[in-house]
UniProtKB/Swiss-Prot annotation:
The family this protein is said to belong to: Belongs to the UPF0122 family.
HAMAP family: UPF0122
InterPro entries: RNA_pol_sigma_r3/r4-like, UPF0122, UPF0122_fam_protein, WH-like_DNA-bd_sf
Full protein name: UPF0122 protein lin1916
PANTHER family xref list: UPF0122 PROTEIN CBO2450/CLC_2298, UPF0122 PROTEIN YLXM
Amino acid sequence: MFEKTNRMNLLFDFYQELLTTKQKSYVSFYYLDDYSLGEIAEEFEVSRQAIYDNIKRTEESLEKYEEKLGMLRKYQQREKLFDQLEAQLTKKNFLDEQVKDTLEQLKNID
């Protein structure tokens, strides 16, 4: 469950602008704020089932966006490569402060 929550949070970070206001609200409450389905239903004055259905559809949408656009996958690949590069430079004692700063800037572009 923890892994799924982390994945949904990351997908939400990348694709939230593609969601409706209602989808953003429900997913934000559920995954980011850790509200229960009942608490969200009470907040929006709808049934628990309506919240559940909407969140499930939104999860499917987020996965479809990722399947087509691959933003999370590419981000994770870049992070892995940056970490490998940093480790290689450190191992060979090439990692001075200027190179370290440049790597950090590259990591933070997205």
